[in-house]
Amino acid sequence: AKSPLSLLAMLLDNRNDEISPSLQAKLDYVRSQLQEDVTQMLYYARLKSSTKDYQFKDINLNDCLGEVLEDYAPLLEEKQFVIINKLQSETVYTDRRGLQFMLGQIVSNAIKYSSDSPMLTISMIHSETADILSVEDNGIGVKKYDLPYIFQKGFTGDSTDSRKKATGMGLYLVKKMADDLNLHLEATSQWGKGFKIVIFFPKLRSNGGK
């Protein structure tokens, strides 16, 4: 059986020529918002489950990111985001669905707290012990005294209009998923200038082991 969201998607796609471009854009935007809410609920349940179905394998990071950006395209286009993707052909060893969920929540966070000329920069550096993925935006950022609490459940920080509407679940779920996948997270921010989140993928197999 098809879910209501997939039926909505099919209806929008099939009736594309009957809907004005502006209405189509608005409906795509609403669909993306609904999809994100459903995704959060599903992963919240998954993270609390005693049986996990993670599949660890080498993942092409660019492919993974591309799918996430495609999912969020209506929201990114609505805000007129500029995406700067500096990734090459890197692979990381992790669970694909889990990583895509993390990246999706990080992108969603950047959209919610974006500036007037929003930009998202994705890059990677390599150290001896880890591959380090950085996702940086130029949005409103987080105040210094709030930064230690951003991964706490329900945290929304300063009471700006956009934060008043937030649930405070996105980055909490990112941290929970990172813990499950044995990934380390770090976040830095300058209030009014942007927010950066860094994911460390440990080089676990450098000596032939996993």
What are these language model-derived features?
Residues 75-84:
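Short conserved segments within the C-terminal catalytic ATPase subdomain
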Residues 137:
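Acidic ATP/Mg2+-coordinating residue in the GHKL
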Residues 110-111:
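Short helix-loop "hinge" at the ATP-lid/N-box region of the Bergerat-fold HATPase_c
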Residues 49-54, 87, 91-97:
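Conserved micro-motifs of the catalytic ATP-binding
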Residues 117-129:
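Short beta-strand/loop element within the Bergerat-fold HATPase_c
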